[in-house]
Amino acid sequence: MSLASSLSASSPDATLPTMKNHTPTYLKHQFLIAMPHMADPNFAQTLTYIVEHNANGAMGLVVNRPQDLSLADILEQLRPDEEPAPRTLNVPIYLGGPVQTDRGFVLHSPECSYQATVELDGMSLTTSQDVLFAIAEGRGPQQSLITLGYAGWEAGQLEEELADNAWLNCPFSPEILFATPSDLRREAAATSLGVTLSLLTSQAGHA
């Protein structure tokens, strides 16, 4: 994996795949909670933030699978002649999904905008390297989560998986994303629905 190419240098073209025709019936800006019987190893026991969902398909970022990587590891590749700031050793990198796992995405609070930033519903998504340098220098967004890779669904695929009870969906919560330990996020999202995951079966319906 080439960490140096994980985020684009500056081009706004290197943002998330273009998807239009969003309607309120889709799950953009919600969490997907993998049901206990989820067999796909890419998504078993995951919590996923839905970046976009429309008639053309869906894109999301898994937000509870930290890798054995830190922001310091990426910065060492991007700026090999500079020692990463000590704070970057404690900034985890998450596996955002099985698609393009050498490509970086930073989900963050909306008070900052960068060279390749897309505004979401009260959140922002950046794919340019400048956000990493800002975080490293202590002038980045107040809240952020860095992933490599993303999850993608073709047109109608996510709807079929929801109908098959592969997922629960629930409203997005910044407290769950940014203030809850990664290993507790999925359970916290389910709890927000009044659901105990260990009691669910494949026959349970989705929210």
Please report, for each region that a protein language model flagged, where it lies by residue.
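A short aromatic-anchored loop/beta-hairpin motif
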Residues: L3, L16-A207
